[in-house]
Amino acid sequence: MIVGIPKEIKNNENRVSLTPAGAHELVQRGHTVYIQHTAGINSGFSDEEYEKVGARILPTIKDVYAIAEMIIKVKEPIECEYNLVRKDQLVFTYFHFACDKELTEAMMRSGSCLLYTS
């Protein structure tokens, strides 16, 4: 599977959804991992740490969404990401659908498969 890790862009969210150790595990199991440039920097992980374990760095969030079969995030997509989610993608993140009708409708329109915990 092609896994994409976009940099979190929601206000005050500094975590990254996959550590270099997690990326290493996925790569060892035959998956391809793409990390958006500087996605891990606010969590203390450099692009080089991801590259050392076999992950590939992409320059933009659009690049990550365009290539990934599965997107892994910490927080739900925000409005500027809605149109990046594709019908054939899995999106794994924390969704808060009950309090965000716009997000709920956008994800329903995307036709993607959503994996979440609330």
Question: Language-model segments: which ranges?
Answer:
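Conserved small/polar residues in nucleotide/adenosyl-binding loops
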Residues: 116-118
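An N-terminal-biased, well-structured beta-alpha scaffold segment characteristic
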Residues: 2-112
